Regions:
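Basic, helix-initiating cap at the start of DNA-binding domains
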Residues: 1-41, 58-61
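C-terminal peripheral helix-coil segments that are non-catalytic and often amphipathic
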Residues: 1-5, 128-139, 165-207
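Amphipathic alpha-helical segments that line or abut small-molecule/effector binding pockets
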Residues: 20, 69, 85-100, 175-183
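Short hydrophobic/aromatic patch on the recognition helix
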Residues: 43-53
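Hydrophobic alpha-helical connector segments
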Residues: 62, 73-101, 114-118, 123-125, ...
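Short linear capping/connector segments at secondary-structure termini
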Residues: 107-116, 196-199
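Amphipathic alpha-helical packing segments from all-alpha helical-bundle domains
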Residues: 115-160, 164-168, 172, 176
Length: 207
């Protein structure tokens, strides 16, 4: 019995080491890190990896599960905030901070590389929350009325570009960009826009 318990404990520790190593490497280098590098970093063999995670997709799911859950929780908190504008700001700050600190998460949410299926499931869960977040801020008169849920991906696309270009020299520079962007989203600053938002079909074609 003790031998069985020891084996189970060893297996659990090995799984934790694999997930921890993958989390660190995905966050630093993105989801294209080879699994051989992950096992080497964990000090384990490929056989151990495949016993726990037969595919890289399964390993990525385990690594990013908590990150996805935190984004959904941030959206839920924003929707529940009494001040809808403050809730929207907090959500954007938390979401972009997650992008800035976790390149793997940013890759997956941008539909780059592995993990696209899990990312789409997360997006399907969070979309109704984002719509409600935007609706509440507009109902309170703090978010410009012509901002649509379909405009929100543009916020992340452009912010991710800032993150990519400045990460090595000023890791938090995206916060300055977000400040400029938020000023443009305030209802009192609104001026007519020259073009309508992308449709859902157009957004899907950009992925």
């Amino acid at each position: 019995m003790n031998a069985v318990k020891t084996l189970r404990s060893d297996a659990r520790r090995n799984r934790e080491r694999l997930v921890a190593s993958a989390r660190e490497l995905f966050a630093a280098h993105g989801v294209d890190v080879p699994v051989e590098e992950i096992t080497h970093h964990a000090g384990l063999g490929m056989g151990t990896l495949y016993r726990h995670f037969p595919t890289k997709e399964e390993l990525l799911d385990a690594v990013l599960e908590d990150a996805f859950a935190e984004l959904v929780a941030a959206a839920e908190e924003a929707v529940a905030a009494d001040d809808a504008w403050a809730g929207l700001i907090r959500f954007l700050e938390r979401a972009l901070a997650a992008h800035a600190s976790n390149r793997g998460l940013k890759d997956v949410l941008a539909a780059r590389g592995q993990g696209a299926q899990r990312a789409e499931a997360m997006r399907a869960r969070i979309r109704p929350l984002l719509r409600r977040m935007i609706q509440r801020a507009q109902e309170q008169g703090t978010l410009r009325a012509d901002f649509k849920p379909e405009d929100l991906p543009l916020v992340f696309w452009t912010a991710d570009r800032v993150i990519d270009r400045t990460a090595a020299v000023a890791p938090d520079y995206w916060r300055r960009y977000l400040g400029f962007l938020l000023d443009g989203l305030r209802a009192e600053a609104a001026t007519p826009l020259p073009r309508p938002p992308l449709t859902r079909a157009q957004l899907d074609r950009t992925a």
